[in-house]
């Protein structure tokens, strides 16, 4: 049975690809799930599906509602949530996803650079692990699934 990991958060770098590559290299039985990572589609889905909205608020609100269907379902089905916080943008959605995971009792791993430690101290305190690199996430998955530490290369 595959282990399902929801990759939440920052969409402007290749961290998801790095995790997927590491999982393939180690032949781990892991299914990766993500939110819509095409920013334009994520922002426009509400208006594109439900029609033009009268204000920017409702444009964003209808898109957020539709995206939440995917996000909530994916989080509820996941064995682990990995939330990446990047330095360039404030990822309020990522913090919200982390909170949903914790509230649902789903294991949480955060992934961010050291300079965000203070800003994310409460989120990190709720996480089972705080990673600095996608490779550390893959190492956690390898250990959790095998129950063994792999020798360092």
Language-model features and meaning:
Residues 1-153:
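Conserved catalytic or regulatory cores that recognize and/or transform ribose-phosphate-containing ligands
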